[in-house]
Amino acid sequence: MKMPKNNVYTVSQLNGEVRQLLEGELGRVWLNAEISNFSSPSSGHWYLTLKDHFAQIRCAMFKGKNRTVTFRPANGQQVLVKGSISVYEPRGDYQLIIESMLPAGDGMLAQQYEALKMKLAAEGLFATDTKRPLPTNINKIGVITSATGAALKDVLHVLARRDPSIEVVVYPTQVQGDNAAKLICRAIELANARQEVDVLLLTRGGGSLEDLWCFNSEDLAHCIYNSALPVVSAVGHEVDTSISDYVADVRAPTPSAGAELLSKDADDKAHKLIAGLSRLKQSWQHYQLKTVQKATALENRLQRQDPKRRLEQFEQSFDEMQLRLNAALNSRIHKLALKQQNLSHRLSQQSPEHRLTLEAKRLDYLTTRLNEGIKDKLHDVELSLKNSAHQLQTVSPLATLSRGYSITQDESGKVLLNAKDAKTGDLLTTRLLEGELRSKVV
């Protein structure tokens, strides 16, 4: 037998070539089949065989992927899986690496979901550069959900706890069923027409794939994309991901998480305000210290340039010169007299009265500027303190009472949130803006 000169493979090289060909040519595939030989070792990976009446294929689903499966696979169960063909090179076996798994009953919906997801992604509805940023200061939130659902209660509870000053406008709508997507679109359009809120929170609680199917509507996706108001999608539980989550500007895993995302903790606001006032006080004290230091430095400079002191120095020098003249020889008297005349002329050019007048005017000007600067700074600080006091007032519980609300407590001081919390015979105290009422449950 004649040996070929080229294309001689080792077994590992051949298996590697086959793996690259299969993975490159087939890519991802969908498979509808029955489970057999299912095993789940301590590593957390799943190993199984998928089969029909005529053939079978070995499969693996690693733990990073099988964590997203919402049911426990069992032998004999019919499933729909998505995966990619690969080769396990040590044995030369070709296998399917599973990425997602659904019961066969959900298969049609899953295929529709993937097809719509790919279509909308190609149209650019998921692009990050088109997403609207959330407002920095949110004062009013529009909630699009069922008026009787648990999601609305969760949202209101979180907002009341974190920031009671945020107003909520509910746009009630059906969030399940054939007409739900159309009704949700109407709610979004109504909110955009009214322009009465800063942001929209589209939300509902968890459910099956069929329950959440309205949030996978193509019409709803375009409605969210075209909204002028920013939209936060908080649909289902953390493991649920709908088309609305991809299109929305921000996705929150649950209704409560959506409410927390859109609210700032009231205690944090108060702490930041107090910290701001403290920094303002320190800045004012620093400014006062600097002003006093500058005034002291100016005063020292003026003292060093005092005309009276300079005149005394000149007089002392003149006396010394007179003593020297008197002690000099007669032959130098004429010369010294001329020198004295020259010195007298120089002194007349440096009149102390003229310089004293200039320095006095300068001192008056600096004093006036210093007083005006202090008055202006005090005025600015007073305005800032008034604004800070107004902000504290808006988050005060007393502000809530001033709008007509009241707080009811039992004998232990616990605040009652539900009428069911009060029992017959309990003594209750209702606090109003001014005073309180005491009552007994009958």
UniProtKB/Swiss-Prot annotation:
Membrane listed as a keyword: no
Pfam families: Exonuc_VII_L, tRNA_anti_2
A single Gene Ontology CC term: exodeoxyribonuclease VII complex
Catalytic activity: Exonucleolytic cleavage in either 5'- to 3'- or 3'- to 5'-direction to yield nucleoside 5'-phosphates
GO BP term, example: DNA catabolic process
EC number: 3.1.11.6
Single GO term (MF): nucleic acid binding
Keywords from the UniProt entry: Cytoplasm, Exonuclease, Hydrolase, Nuclease
Family according to the record: Belongs to the XseA family.
PANTHER family the UniProt entry points to: EXODEOXYRIBONUCLEASE 7 LARGE SUBUNIT (PTHR30008:SF0)
Function: Bidirectionally degrades single-stranded DNA into large acid-insoluble oligonucleotides, which are then degraded further into small acid-soluble oligonucleotides.
Summary of subunit composition and partner proteins: Heterooligomer composed of large and small subunits.
Protein name listed in UniProt: Exodeoxyribonuclease 7 large subunit
Organism: Shewanella woodyi (strain ATCC 51908 / MS32)
Taxonomic lineage: Bacteria, Pseudomonadati, Pseudomonadota, Gammaproteobacteria, Alteromonadales
Gene name per UniProt: xseA
